[in-house]
Amino acid sequence: MAKTPLTVTVITDTHYYSKKTGTKGKAYDAANAKSQKLLKYSEELLRAAFKQIKEDKRTDIVLLSGDTTNNGEIEAHAEVIEILRDLKKSGKRVYVLTATHDYQDDGLTDSFVGNEKVKIPAAKREQLYDMYKEFGPDEAIAVHRDSMSYVVQLADGYRLFALNDDRNLSGKSGFSDECFEWIKAQAEDARKNDQFILAMTHHPLIAPSPIYELIGKNDMLGDYETRRNELADLGIQFILTGHTHVHDIDVITSDRGNTLYDIATAATVGYPAPIRTIVFDPDVKMVSTTTDLITETVDFDLEGKTLQEYLKYQLIGMVKDMIKAAGTDIPTLADMATAMSIKKKLIYKIGWLIKPFAKKLNALTIGKVAKLTRAETGLKPEDYADIADKSVVDFICDLVVNLYGGEDLYSVDDNEYKITVGLLHIVDSVFAALHIKPRKLIKVADSFTDFAEPLLHNSGIPSYDAILPIRPFYKEGEQGKKPQEEKKPECSVKKSKKGVPIVVCGILALIILLLLLLLFF
């Protein structure tokens, strides 16, 4: 039976924060000043996004995939529910998932009064279903009550699987085995009835970059490597996610040959404040996604900037402060690192190693790095004269913007790209000379070039606007072909031959140091 194309609007991670819980004073500043989230103005950002969505006539379906509130504050829930009701009154159909930021196990969270943190009521997990049942569960054709997951018939031939992953009963996010059996039964029923499945959950199943997979592994969906293959083999080919605050689209293919696209949308409350629109058209085997940024006027002072410039300034300021702290104050760095999904204990563990490098980093320029990589890049000083004085810290900020914003700031032809890859090739050559495989250390990539290069350039699916082919589904017992990987653009940077000389010089320096110690001590 022919299916009419279905269009949906997607936002996530609104982190709504009630002003009643405090937006000024030393306690608030200490807790939130170094965050990428613009909590103080989360209401203004959400209202601007919803005004824009109300005026968008492409669809009446709006999906929110979790972390609706900042930390589960009862006041925040009450206020955001009224804003969601107002969106429904405009004629929109609104479907909401809650997630880990929407409740506290003890029913308490922090508010800020002057210099003090004061405990206030927060929602407990068991309260959330009734609080949000008018945004999805009330019209569900199936509900898994314990996980608060539900299935809705969005239109003829289309079902939404809203899969709550806030716990898997094994100490992680994700789905319990019992919940997954329910998902499996619902997927089988959908396929039997010729229903196209659109799924949404909160935590990502595919990391937006190798670096994120290493430092933010605990922020991925629990058992993601297994679950993403299982979901693909259930016929769930498209899943909408959030949590990372990174705008990204990625894809995996299961061993059986089935496909899963993870379409991640960045947070409304941080850079770049996107609204994603997706059109599903099974009859032509195509899904298209486009991204709009919040452009409605917001009710706070942007200090002469556009909204995106203001949010970018917030993000970059946080990164610069982190790099400064890395060279001077490891406890402060540990406190700040949680805003980027980096665990405090990891910072304390490697802080001694980070500190001396961070001190040098704060004074380093691209020109100085370029001199080290001339043999690899073939660049002459006049080739990079326009960027020679650019701070490496500013360049790192560009990479963070690249990651969170889903942008593609550098191509393989840009000198910043060549210089960075040249440096990474030198590092790889040192490890090769030492016969050490980088994967043993970094776990998620075979080389340091493969580990860091995706921060420079996205050679995969565009994060903002993309056409995604709907691929065939293979039942159990069938075997599909894995699609050919797209070739990466040719890069002119040569592999480095400096590894052996660097290792030899290092060994000689160590021998000389030991001899001096023996002679004088």
Q: For each predicted feature, which ranges?
A:
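Extended active-site neighborhood of metal-dependent phosphoesterases/phosphodiesterases
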Residues: 74, 79-182, 188, 256, ...
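Active-site glycine-centered loops adjacent to acidic/histidine catalytic or metal-binding residues
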Residues: 13, 66-67, 99-100, 202, ...
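His/acidic metal-ligating clusters that form di-metal
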Residues: 56-61, 159-161, 170-261, 322, ...
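N-terminal active-site segment of His-dependent metallophosphoesterases
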Residues: 1-74
